[in-house]
Amino acid sequence: MPFQIPDDLNRDLMPLAWMIGHWEGEGHGNTPDDGEFSFGCQVDFTDNGGDYLHYICQTFTMNPDGTPAAPLRMETGFWRPNVDTRKVDVLMAAPEGWAEVWTGNIDGAKIELVTDAVARTEEALVPYTGGQRLYGQVEGDLLWTFDRATVDAPLQPYMWARLKRS
């Protein structure tokens, strides 16, 4: 699906313009406790005229016919790029009981992020401590990876997906 940069897009969002829209696809993951798994994924990057993008990512288990079966995880947040330095700050929160501050670099259609801070509740579902992410555009698709560390496990691949703009 072709993408056009909106005429009224805030100048500061130009480095992230390729991300704007609705993306869907499938991904895979791996945890030390549960092993390998597959999931469906929907990601939305939206613009309201400000100097940030709103982000929401929903993953879910899938029925045999490929339709969503049950929620797996969800996160939402804000992406705030600096057009002059090609850096980006990302704030995210998840209902599993944590909030994150990510920092990173924008290199064309590739964005690398690392956690600057992770705050979690006493009842957080996973003792998550930090991570790395990579977002990129390949052949028009959005590819992302999420490596995660916990109190019990060092940084390791956790989730990855390839999504198509829809």
Swiss-Prot record:
Residue ranges of the motif GXWXGXG: 21-27
Entry superkingdom: Bacteria
Pfam family, one: THAP4_heme-bd
InterPro entries: Calycin (IPR012674), Nb(III)_bact/plant (IPR022939), Nitrobindin (IPR045165), THAP4-like_heme-bd (IPR014878)
Family: Belongs to the nitrobindin family.
Protein name: Ferric nitrobindin-like protein
